[in-house]
UniProtKB/Swiss-Prot annotation:
Function, in words: Catalyzes the isomerization between 2-isopropylmalate and 3-isopropylmalate, via the formation of 2-isopropylmaleate.
Assembly with partners or alone: Heterodimer of LeuC and LeuD.
Top-level EC class: lyase
Molecular function via GO: 3-isopropylmalate dehydratase activity; 4 iron, 4 sulfur cluster binding; metal ion binding
Cofactor note: Binds 1 [4Fe-4S] cluster per subunit.
GO biological process: L-leucine biosynthetic process
Protein name in the entry: 3-isopropylmalate dehydratase large subunit
Source taxon at top rank: Bacteria
Cofactor requirement: [4Fe-4S] cluster
Species this chain originates from: Shewanella sp. (strain W3-18-1)
Record-linked InterPro entries: 3-IsopropMal_deHydase_lsu, Acnase/IPM_dHydase_lsu_aba_1/3, Acoase/IPM_deHydtase_lsu_aba, Aconitase_4Fe-4S_BS, Aconitase_4Fe-4S_dom, IPM_dehydratase_rel_enz, IPMI_cat
EC number: 4.2.1.33
Length: 474
């Protein structure tokens, strides 16, 4: 918290960043805000670039636009021949658009290519106090740095490319404080799943959430990114964490971070970007970190989640008719019975990756449970690093060998099995322990059954063949 000068209005982190970016407030219309960084990929950008060409427009600030290929790329081969006809068209179109408009592109052959929400932060493109947008719903990831980051639609992508601005209504503010410290075996993924389980998948609708408290402050930047990544899964517009020394240490020396005197000046500014003492939030949610156990979803949205030592809930215990019906529908799709212990649920697929959990810390955590073990019979497990940098670092540490020797598949960077868009997808009836962010019906493939977990929980399930409590011997 920061102290407010006398007679000044106390502001939240979000309000400070918002106010610093309002360009104009036309009467009767949504405010116009400035965009500092625009991230694009091959799926949501083609129509936007086409619109610019039809209108004869150029990019307002091509140096503030960064492109990568991630959603529809192959994790088996870096060759265009490995792509489906549609995927190949998408990546080739992005390459041509970037060439035509002067946009920096990290294509499938670039050593820094990766998932947009992984490679952006590790290159220092993501900075505190900035506004960042991308045609992707999990852009909130970048809020871990104290940035205001959110997903936009394709028409908005075109608007930002042309003007470097965006019309936006100001959101309400929510503080989610996680007090105290977590126990061994509990990760950032468990924290955010517990939060969503508490407030529901629509509990954050209309809000920008600031995550705070000792448990959040103790997280690495990788952990904070995991938490902010899933802010959208509680319905929030964005998630943010105030920048601190952990943030500055992570950013120091990265390619697009300030250098020299600019660095010192930037840090001085960033240190002031935090919620003031006395600032009032529109809503406050509190959790005790000590109460959080490793989490595991049982249904078809991230809010349908319980602790690993719990059981599949019974819809009959739910008083709300709408919620009860939703639970019944979820159980029918997911193929589970009420009262089943979570540790009795067997799996046949494991996916460790996605913009939620594919960073080096995530892979290290999973490798602990893979080392010296073997993937269970009948289980297929894949590990997909989030970027070329993550892959190279993991291989330098020998993590790839640990996974391969245990029977995991070691892949190339990309969004992979998070969504059934590329070749990495589940078959009908497959049950997957996944480190991704969504467990909707068909998300990983038609008829697929997804259980969201941390990387450690996913790796443990791979070797056990079923979900286990990683806090105990298994």
């Amino acid at each position: 918290m920061t102290t407010v000068p006398k007679n000044a209005v106390a502001k939240t982190l979000y309000q400070k960043v918002w106010d610093a970016h309002v360009v104009a407030t036309p009467e009767g219309e949504a405010p116009i805000i400035y965009v500092d960084r625009h991230l694009v990929h091959e799926v949501t950008s083609p129509q936007a670039f086409s619109g610019l060409k039809v209108a004869g427009r150029k990019l307002r600030a091509p140096e503030k636009t960064f492109a990568t290929m991630d959603h529809n790329t192959s994790t088996r081969s870096a060759s265009l021949d490995a792509l489906s006809p549609m995927a190949r068209t998408q990546v080739e179109t992005l390459a041509q658009n970037c060439k035509d408009f002067g946009v920096r592109l990290y294509d499938i052959h670039h050593p820094n290519q990766g998932i947009v929400h992984v490679m952006g932060p590790e290159l220092g493109i993501t900075l505190p106090g900035t506004v960042i947008v991308c045609g992707d719903s999990h852009t909130a990831t970048h809020g871990a740095f104290g940035a205001l980051a959110f997903g936009i639609g394709t028409s908005e992508v075109e608007h930002v490319l042309a003007t470097q601005t965006l019309r936006q209504l100001k959101a309400k503010t929510m503080k989610i404080e996680v007090r105290g410290h977590v126990s061994d075996g509990v990760t950032a993924k468990d924290i955010v799943l517990a939060i969503i389980g508490k407030i529901g998948m629509d509990g954050g609708t209309g809000y920008v959430v600031e995550f705070c408290g000792e448990a959040i402050e103790a997280l690495s930047m990788e952990g904070r990114m995991t938490v902010c990544n899933m802010a959208i899964e509680m319905g929030a517009k964005a998630g943010m964490v105030a920048p601190d020394q952990t943030t500055f240490d992570y950013l120091a020396g990265r390619e697009f971070a300030p250098k020299g005197e600019d660095w010192a000046e930037a840090v001085a500014y960033w240190q002031a970007i935090k919620t003031d003492d006395g600032a009032v939030f529109d809503a406050v949610v509190e959790l005790d970190a000590a109460d959080i156990a490793p989490q595991l979803t049982w249904g078809t949205n991230p809010g349908q989640v319980v602790a690993i030592d719990g059981k599949v809930p019974n819809p009959l215990d739910e008083a709300n008719p709408s919620t009860r019906a939703s639970m019944e529908k979820a159980l029918e799709y997911i193929g589970l019975s009420a009262g089943t212990p979570m540790t009795d649920i067997s799996i046949n697929k494991v996916f460790i990756g996605s913009c939620t959990n594919s960073r080096i810390e995530d892979l290290r955590s999973a490798a602990v449970h893979a080392k010296g073990r073997k993937v269970a019979s009948g289980v297929t497990a894949i590990v997909v690093p989030g970027s070329g940098q993550v892959k190279a670092q993991a291989e330098a540490e020998g993590l790839d060998k640990i996974f391969i020797e245990a029977g995991f598949e070691w892949r190339l960077p990309g969004c992979s099995m998070c969504l059934a868009m590329n070749d990495d997808r589940l078959e009908a009836g497959d049950r997957c322990a996944s480190t991704s962010n969504r467990n909707f019906e068909g998300r990983q493939g038609r008829g697929s059954r997804t259980h969201l977990v941390s990387p450690a929980m996913a790796a443990a399930a791979a070797v056990a063949g079923h979900f286990v409590d990683i806090r105990k011997p298994y």
